[in-house]
UniProtKB/Swiss-Prot annotation:
Cross-link Glycyl lysine isopeptide (Lys-Gly) (interchain with G-Cter in ubiquitin) residue location(s): K242, K481
Any GO molecular function: identical protein binding
Subcellular location(s) per record: Cytoplasm, Cytoskeleton
UniProt record, GO biological process: actin cortical patch localization; endocytosis; lipid tube assembly; mitotic actomyosin contractile ring assembly; plasma membrane tubulation; protein localization to cell division site; regulation of endocytosis; vesicle-mediated transport
InterPro entries: AH/BAR_dom_sf (IPR027267), BAR_dom (IPR004148), BIN3/RVS161-like (IPR046982), SH3-like_dom_sf (IPR036028), SH3_domain (IPR001452)
Lipoprotein listed as a keyword: no
Protein name (Swiss-Prot/TrEMBL): Reduced viability upon starvation protein 167
Pfam hit, one: BAR
């Protein structure tokens, strides 16, 4: 925008606001307003005709290109999964020769159709789209003139408001008289300019509308016959398609069902089609803990063999001798979940502070539920570290209470069995059907015996129900209070 245009826009801004809010005196011409409305419709419909014609031509060409790509994809699907050609001498062919041949024939027909329809599609571009674009250029020039007329209308209304303001003064001064004459001259000039553009548009817009009707009529007829020719060519070529692989005489749904057979049932029988990512991650984590923790660095056996937590002056004889004190180390600690509360308070055969600290350090890396693996506690490393009881303790009854910090490897296997708690059970909240091998199925309300579980209910637990052992999601059950 030039500086002159900018100054005019600034001077017209107040009148634009008045016109928008219907304030002050405004010039109206119903005849031009009706012509302006029809002109806007003409502009919109011409744009729509041009865009839709171009979209139709592009869509037909794109459809044929898509069908060629579809035929190529079907050829790849019919080939074996290795991507290599099958052995023609094989008893059972790995690929589908009939399907590949049908795809190649269909691709050839569509490619030929695309070449045949190229002149018709080019004709749509030449006879419909190009004339519409030329008409839009003419409409753009007329739109500029209509904008010019609207600007002159704003100037006329602005000068009329100024003239009326000075004319209504009851006691005008000399300067007011001078401003009145100046405003009157501006009104006369603005009126002449506005009348010129307004009369020009009112006179010539109806002529444009009549010419537009004569212009659109042949375009519509041409576009109709072009589409008819394109559809007729498509219908005839596809109707005469001689591909034995396709049965065009039978019902399409029946043919599809007959060729599909029991493929859907065979696919549903595959395990990978029912794969659940969340369950598989939890199972993988549980498998790692179950089978990989025995050799891990934090297991009780590895901790004892490495000697972590033992002092330099460790004495095995002292570690195995019972202490005559009351409850020994850890008696004030809260009762461990693995100990029966009714037997608490009897004398405990716990070693010295050094031995207790050592056993606690070794048991810190233990995994609950895995201590039956340490039945061979009479091995030399464990005996030397004080984990074997004295002969007097082995001959007499096992102690009624075992220190939680030294469980599960602080005593002999007999002591571990005696300290085992009651069977922990859970009640099923929902029905669960096994999703894979190793899962445990159960109905809602079933009481399941816990073999191994974790504190997190969102992980998989191991249980036993109806003589079967397997894993199940922890959030499907509720722990029973003993």
């Amino acid at each position: 925008m030039s500086f002159k245009g900018f100054t005019k826009a600034v001077s017209r801004a107040p009148q634009s606001f008045r016109q928008k809010f219907k304030m002050g005196e405004q010039t109206e011409d119903p005849v031009y307003e009706d012509a302006e409305r029809r002109f806007q419709e003409l502009e919109q419909e011409t744009k729509k005709l041009s865009e839709e014609s171009k979209r139709y031509s592009t869509a037909v060409n794109g459809m044929l290109t898509h069908q060629i790509g579809f035929a190529k994809s079907m050829e790849e699907i019919f080939k074996p999964i290795s991507g290599k050609m099958s052995d023609p001498n094989a008893t059972i062919p790995e690929d589908n020769p009939q399907g590949i041949e049908a795809s190649e024939q269909y691709r050839a027909i569509v490619a030929e159709l695309q070449e045949t329809l190229k002149p018709d599609l080019a004709l749509v571009e030449e006879k419909i789209v190009t004339p519409c674009q030329e008409l839009l250029k003419i409409i753009t020039y007329i739109r500029k003139m209509a904008t010019k007329r609207n600007h002159k209308k704003l100037d006329l209304d602005r000068h009329l408001n100024t003239y009326n303001k000075h004319e209504k003064k009851k006691e005008p001064t000399a300067k007011d008289e001078e401003r009145l004459y100046k405003a009157q001259a501006q009104v006369e000039v603005a009126q002449q300019e506005y009348d010129y553009y307004n009369d020009l548009l009112k006179t010539q817009l109806p002529i444009l509308f009549s010419l537009e009707a004569e212009f659109v009529k042949p375009l519509f007829v041409s576009f109709y016959f072009m589409q008819l020719n394109i559809f007729y060519t498509l219908y005839n070529r596809l109707q005469d398609m001689k591909i034995p692989y396709f049965d065009l005489n039978s019902d399409i749904v029946e043919s599809y069902i007959a060729k599909k057979g029991n493929v859907e049932e065979q696919t549903d029988a595959l395990t990978i089609t029912h794969f659940k990512l969340g369950y598989s991650k939890a199972k993988l984590e549980m498998t790692r803990r179950k089978y990989g923790v025995a050799t891990a660095e934090g297991s009780p056996v590895s901790g004892a063999s490495s000697g972590v937590g033992y002092g330099a002056g460790y004495d095995p004889a002292t570690a195995t001798s019972p202490t005559p004190t009351g409850y020994g180390y850890g008696a004030a600690a809260p009762s461990y979940a693995a100990q029966p509360a009714a037997q608490y308070g009897t004398a405990a055969a716990v070693g010295t502070a050094a031995a207790v600290g050592t056993a606690a350090g070794a048991a810190a890396g233990a995994v609950p539920g895995t201590y039956p693996q340490y039945a061979a506690a009479q091995s030399p490393p464990l005996t030397g570290l004080g984990f074997q009881q004295s002969p007097q303790q082995q001959q007499g009854p096992p102690p009624a209470y075992s220190n939680p910090l030294t469980s599960p490897v602080a005593g002999t296997p007999a002591a571990a069995v005696a300290a085992a708690p009651g069977v922990e059970t859970v009640t099923a909240l929902y029905d669960y059907q096994a999703q894979a091998a190793g899962d445990l199925s159960f109905p809602a309300g079933a009481v399941i015996e816990i073999v191994q579980r974790t504190p997190d209910v969102n992980e998989w637990w191991t249980g036993r129900y109806n003589g079967q052992q397997g894993v199940f999601p922890g959030n499907y059950v509720q722990l029973n209070k003993n």
